[in-house]
Amino acid sequence: MKIKLEVSAARCEALERELTALGIDIDDDAPLVLRERNAYPDILTVRDAATNERVRLPVCDIITAEAFGHDVEVFTSSGRYLALSRLYQLQAELDPERFLRISNSVIVARAHIQRISPALSMKFTLTLSDKRRVDVTRSFYYTFKEYMGI
């Protein structure tokens, strides 16, 4: 049997030893997932957009995740990656204190917001650390204001 572990770093090594001793293989591609309640991963498995190879991406490097149709692209300062899941699934995996959905198609990392500019008709335009601009749509306007404390 193969499982994927999504637990805190403090528990990961001990759990991995115990499960391996029981004959259970730990694999990032396993169909079953053992997840710690209220624990968010430090690393996501994604595909490199250029080579299509699987890459373990540190969550702290993520600037945005954007949905384009059925594809979800994850942007970092070092490049562009393709998520292995839908945007709503990715949102559930990310820490809500560090990431916020700002439209139906964009999740943004709070730490990478450099400038917040008000726009017409209950919108904000965000300038990110990679100099890209993204819009907070009207549907997410009040959630964003509360989250950012403005």
Place the predicted regions along the sequence by residue.
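Basic, polyanion-interacting recognition surfaces, primarily
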Residues: 1-150
